[in-house]
Each structure stands twice: as structure tokens, then as C-alpha cells.
Amino acid sequence: MSCVSKKQLMLDMTKKELRQQIKQLKSMTPLAVRQVEADMVFNTIKTMPVWLQAQHILCYWSLPDELPTHESVNNWLAEGKSIYLPRVKGDDLEIVPYHGAESLDDNNKFHIGEPVGDAVDSSCLELIIVPAVALDQNRNRLGRGKGFYDRLLSSTSCPTIGVACEFQLVDEVPVEPHDHPLDCVVTSDAIITDEEKRYLFMAQ
């Protein structure tokens, strides 16, 4: 086995171990607690300059083990924001307008509620809110390992915010050369920003 493949194997093992640790912590955290944390996270985001300026926002329709978004997404839609959700197409994510929970379809490979309708170009987005298995102090993100968000984020330059419960914020997430940190990380107890883009996320 080459040095490169050995290094990759060790990295994959470390990512797998971290995902397993977070999974155990999630199983010990009631949904009601995660909902309280979600309310705190999204209330924080709604005070940020980037949120106040953005009209077209990509979020995610949360799975049972993710920071809950259903209530917030519906509230934002009612408040007049243009909300978009991801839809899996092959190895990539399409960006589709969200018109309400009744328009979602979970008849797909991952049984995720996905919006129906025509996809739009990601260039219309002004803010992306990203789920994570784990986030770290350097704004690195660990996902589920499929690479969907990695590919999406590499194709857009709009501001990105990673959100998670407090226990999902760790000292260090294993990264690879092609990984790029998010612009901002928000938990119920922390805001971590790129200093050069701090003006987008911190009220002056």
C-alpha cells in the first residue's frame, strides 16, 4: 500500500470514528433539546447583516438526526424570504424553490423530503445554510461522506453558514486538500467567522 493510500485510509477511519461518536451523542439528545438549540441558532442568524440583506436563501429540510429546520423554513417563507431546498440528482444537488411542506416528495433513494418543480441556477443564491455531522473551530465541516455539499459549495461563491447542535462542534475535523472551510459556523453557544467576512455575520 502506498503512502498516499495509507494516509487516505487513516483519514477515512478518523472520519468514520468521528461520525460514530456524534451519532452516539445524537441518540442521547432528545428532539426537544435539539429544537431549542435550533431556535437559538436561527434566531442568531436572523440578526446577521447577511440574513437581513439576502432574499434568496438555500437551507435544508432536516432529517430526524439533523438540527431541525422545518418550523424555521416555513416561518421564513411566510415572512417573505425566497427559500430553496436541495434535491439529489445523480452525484449532485439541484436547487429548487420551496413552496411549502405539501409540495415535498420523499419518494427518492434517501427518503428525504425534496421539493418538486424546476431547478434554478445556484448563482441566484445569496446565502446557503448547511447541515453538518460535525463542525470545528476552523469552520471545517464533516458531512455524511457522499460529497453532495462539497460539490455544491465548490461551485458557488455566496456566503455559507454551517449549523449544528453545540455537541457537534469539535476541536478539529479531519480535512483533505480539496476541502474548503465555511464562511461561518453557528451553534447555540458559538459564532465562528472568517475574519475577512466578519462584517457579513456580526452586527456592527
Language model: regions and residue ranges:
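Conserved phosphate- and dinucleotide-binding cores of soluble alpha/beta proteins
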Residues: D91-Q204
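N-terminal active-site beta-alpha-beta segment that forms phosphate/nucleotide-binding
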Residues: L9-S123
